């Protein structure tokens, strides 16, 4: 789930295996450390944290922030054969590709991490202020159309969750209505 969300793989100079790296803003520092404690427990590797300054590159999404400097926390696991193995499944020509094989590797905690990295729970209210629906959106705009279709099919075939691809600027996001959002949340609790 981490690689589907806010983590990436990095191959260091003269390295044989890939390193897993995540970046989050200071508000998500505790969440970042929690994710890496899971990895440390399961992979037996230590990690290190660094505080960096980055420049906002998302000109198309947030034009007012282009070029602004901001603080990020970066955590690196170090190289590991498992990271290299998953990268071979997930990347084609150095681009993330979400295959059915990759999706079968997801666990409920992996889904939860992906949701916490790239998901959103929205509420719609009636005129009187009462909540009438809860909807989940999973931001999958960074994946190609085939990957997006694979994700929709995975949720339907595995959990009987009917997700829909909704237009978002020049791409699509996965949207779940109230019924399907409840199913999803029951899996990732």
Regions inferred by a protein language model and the residue ranges of each:
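Internal intein/HINT superfamily modules and their associated LAGLIDADG
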Residues: 2-189
